[in-house]
Amino acid sequence: GMWVAVHAHGAEGMKRAVIAGVDSVEHGTFMTEEVMDLMIKNGTYYVPTISAGEFVAEKSKIDNYFPEIVRPKAANVGPQISSTFAKAYKRGVKIAFGTDAGVQPHGTNLKEFIYMVNSGMPNIEAIKSATIETAKLLKIDSELGSISVGKLADLVAVNGDPLDDIANIQNISFVMKDGKRINHND
Protein backbone atom coordinates (compact mmCIF):
# COMPACT_ATOMS: atom_id res chain seq x y z
CA GLY A 1 0.00 0.00 0.00
CA MET A 2 0.81 3.65 0.11
CA TRP A 3 3.32 4.96 2.65
CA VAL A 4 1.88 7.84 4.74
CA ALA A 5 3.59 10.28 7.09
CA VAL A 6 1.77 12.89 9.14
CA HIS A 7 3.17 16.30 10.10
CA ALA A 8 1.67 16.75 13.56
CA HIS A 9 2.40 18.79 16.65
CA GLY A 10 -0.80 18.31 18.67
CA ALA A 11 -1.78 15.10 20.45
CA GLU A 12 -5.32 14.87 19.04
CA GLY A 13 -4.10 15.08 15.44
CA MET A 14 -1.45 12.45 16.14
CA LYS A 15 -3.96 10.17 17.83
CA ARG A 16 -6.38 10.33 14.90
CA ALA A 17 -3.58 9.79 12.37
CA VAL A 18 -2.15 6.79 14.23
CA ILE A 19 -5.60 5.21 14.58
CA ALA A 20 -6.09 5.79 10.83
CA GLY A 21 -2.89 3.83 10.18
CA VAL A 22 -0.17 6.29 9.19
CA ASP A 23 3.36 4.92 8.96
CA SER A 24 5.04 7.77 10.84
CA VAL A 25 4.49 10.91 12.86
CA GLU A 26 6.86 13.77 12.04
CA HIS A 27 7.69 16.29 14.83
CA GLY A 28 5.23 14.99 17.44
CA THR A 29 5.93 18.03 19.59
CA PHE A 30 3.13 17.58 22.14
CA MET A 31 2.86 13.78 21.96
CA THR A 32 1.18 12.25 25.00
CA GLU A 33 1.75 8.87 26.62
CA GLU A 34 -1.60 7.77 25.16
CA VAL A 35 -0.34 8.54 21.65
CA MET A 36 2.99 6.84 22.38
CA ASP A 37 1.17 3.70 23.48
CA LEU A 38 -0.99 3.75 20.33
CA MET A 39 2.16 4.14 18.22
CA ILE A 40 3.78 1.17 19.95
CA LYS A 41 0.61 -0.92 19.48
CA ASN A 42 0.32 0.01 15.78
CA GLY A 43 4.05 -0.07 14.98
CA THR A 44 4.01 3.60 14.00
CA TYR A 45 7.39 5.32 13.71
CA TYR A 46 8.28 8.66 15.29
CA VAL A 47 10.51 11.01 13.26
CA PRO A 48 11.30 13.68 15.85
CA THR A 49 13.16 16.31 13.80
CA ILE A 50 14.87 17.65 16.93
CA SER A 51 17.29 19.68 14.82
CA ALA A 52 14.42 21.62 13.24
CA GLY A 53 13.05 22.47 16.67
CA GLU A 54 16.46 23.52 17.96
CA PHE A 55 17.06 25.67 14.87
CA VAL A 56 13.72 27.44 15.28
CA ALA A 57 14.34 27.94 19.02
CA GLU A 58 17.77 29.45 18.31
CA LYS A 59 16.39 31.79 15.64
CA SER A 60 13.66 32.96 18.03
CA LYS A 61 16.38 34.84 19.94
CA ILE A 62 17.05 37.09 16.92
CA ASP A 63 14.94 40.25 16.76
CA ASN A 64 12.63 40.36 13.74
CA TYR A 65 13.53 36.84 12.56
CA PHE A 66 9.99 35.75 13.42
CA PRO A 67 6.94 37.95 13.96
CA GLU A 68 6.78 38.95 17.63
CA ILE A 69 3.65 36.88 18.20
CA VAL A 70 5.48 33.71 17.01
CA ARG A 71 8.68 34.13 19.06
CA PRO A 72 7.48 32.52 22.33
CA LYS A 73 6.17 29.44 20.51
CA ALA A 74 9.36 29.18 18.45
CA ALA A 75 11.52 29.50 21.58
CA ASN A 76 9.74 26.57 23.23
CA VAL A 77 9.57 24.14 20.31
CA GLY A 78 13.21 22.94 20.50
CA PRO A 79 13.19 22.00 24.17
CA GLN A 80 9.69 20.51 23.84
CA ILE A 81 10.63 18.22 20.92
CA SER A 82 13.75 17.09 22.81
CA SER A 83 11.67 16.31 25.88
CA THR A 84 9.02 14.46 23.87
CA PHE A 85 11.71 12.49 22.03
CA ALA A 86 13.34 11.42 25.31
CA LYS A 87 10.00 10.18 26.66
CA ALA A 88 9.04 8.40 23.43
CA TYR A 89 12.41 6.67 23.19
CA LYS A 90 12.29 5.51 26.81
CA ARG A 91 8.72 4.26 26.34
CA GLY A 92 9.71 2.14 23.33
CA VAL A 93 8.29 4.05 20.35
CA LYS A 94 10.11 3.14 17.14
CA ILE A 95 12.36 6.02 16.06
CA ALA A 96 13.48 6.93 12.53
CA PHE A 97 15.89 9.72 11.62
CA GLY A 98 14.63 12.86 9.90
CA THR A 99 15.42 16.55 9.93
CA ASP A 100 12.54 18.42 8.23
CA ALA A 101 14.47 19.45 5.11
CA GLY A 102 14.46 23.14 4.40
CA VAL A 103 14.18 24.38 7.98
CA GLN A 104 17.89 24.63 8.74
CA PRO A 105 20.73 25.19 6.25
CA HIS A 106 21.78 22.29 4.03
CA GLY A 107 24.63 20.29 5.50
CA THR A 108 23.67 20.73 9.15
CA ASN A 109 21.38 17.70 9.40
CA LEU A 110 24.05 15.58 11.11
CA LYS A 111 23.38 17.61 14.26
CA GLU A 112 20.26 15.47 14.66
CA PHE A 113 22.52 12.63 15.88
CA ILE A 114 23.96 14.87 18.59
CA TYR A 115 20.52 16.04 19.71
CA MET A 116 19.24 12.46 19.86
CA VAL A 117 22.18 11.32 21.97
CA ASN A 118 21.95 14.39 24.21
CA SER A 119 18.29 13.49 24.77
CA GLY A 120 19.12 10.00 26.02
CA MET A 121 19.45 7.73 22.99
CA PRO A 122 22.64 5.61 22.92
CA ASN A 123 25.01 6.37 20.03
CA ILE A 124 24.43 3.04 18.30
CA GLU A 125 20.65 3.51 18.45
CA ALA A 126 20.95 6.99 16.93
CA ILE A 127 22.99 5.51 14.07
CA LYS A 128 20.45 2.70 13.61
CA SER A 129 17.64 5.30 13.51
CA ALA A 130 19.28 6.75 10.38
CA THR A 131 20.12 3.42 8.77
CA ILE A 132 18.12 0.25 9.33
CA GLU A 133 15.16 1.88 11.12
CA THR A 134 14.63 4.50 8.42
CA ALA A 135 14.99 1.80 5.76
CA LYS A 136 12.31 -0.25 7.56
CA LEU A 137 10.03 2.77 7.78
CA LEU A 138 10.41 3.41 4.05
CA LYS A 139 9.98 -0.31 3.35
CA ILE A 140 13.34 -0.55 1.55
CA ASP A 141 15.23 -2.54 4.20
CA SER A 142 15.66 -5.45 1.77
CA GLU A 143 17.93 -3.13 -0.26
CA LEU A 144 19.36 -0.60 2.20
CA GLY A 145 19.90 0.13 5.87
CA SER A 146 22.49 -2.46 6.83
CA ILE A 147 25.63 -4.06 5.47
CA SER A 148 24.51 -7.42 4.12
CA VAL A 149 25.14 -9.63 1.11
CA GLY A 150 22.77 -8.65 -1.68
CA LYS A 151 22.08 -5.13 -0.43
CA LEU A 152 23.27 -1.96 -2.12
CA ALA A 153 26.70 -0.90 -0.93
CA ASP A 154 25.80 2.64 0.15
CA LEU A 155 28.14 3.59 2.99
CA VAL A 156 29.54 6.60 4.78
CA ALA A 157 32.98 6.20 6.36
CA VAL A 158 33.99 8.58 9.13
CA ASN A 159 37.21 9.47 10.91
CA GLY A 160 36.89 8.54 14.57
CA ASP A 161 34.48 6.21 16.28
CA PRO A 162 30.92 7.56 16.51
CA LEU A 163 30.19 4.96 19.19
CA ASP A 164 32.71 6.76 21.42
CA ASP A 165 31.65 10.28 20.41
CA ILE A 166 28.61 10.76 18.20
CA ALA A 167 30.06 14.06 16.92
CA ASN A 168 32.59 11.94 14.98
CA ILE A 169 29.78 11.15 12.56
CA GLN A 170 30.35 14.64 11.13
CA ASN A 171 33.98 13.79 10.21
CA ILE A 172 33.22 12.17 6.86
CA SER A 173 36.15 10.38 5.25
CA PHE A 174 34.36 9.13 2.13
CA VAL A 175 31.00 8.08 0.72
CA MET A 176 30.33 4.89 -1.22
CA LYS A 177 27.30 4.68 -3.52
CA ASP A 178 26.38 1.35 -5.14
CA GLY A 179 29.81 0.01 -4.17
CA LYS A 180 31.71 2.87 -5.81
CA ARG A 181 33.68 5.39 -3.80
CA ILE A 182 32.49 8.92 -4.49
CA ASN A 183 35.32 11.43 -4.59
CA HIS A 184 34.71 14.78 -2.93
CA ASN A 185 35.70 16.60 -6.13
CA ASP A 186 33.41 14.61 -8.46
Each language-model region and where it sits:
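Active-site core of metal-dependent hydrolases
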Residues: G1-G78, A101-V103, G120-P122, K136-L138, ...
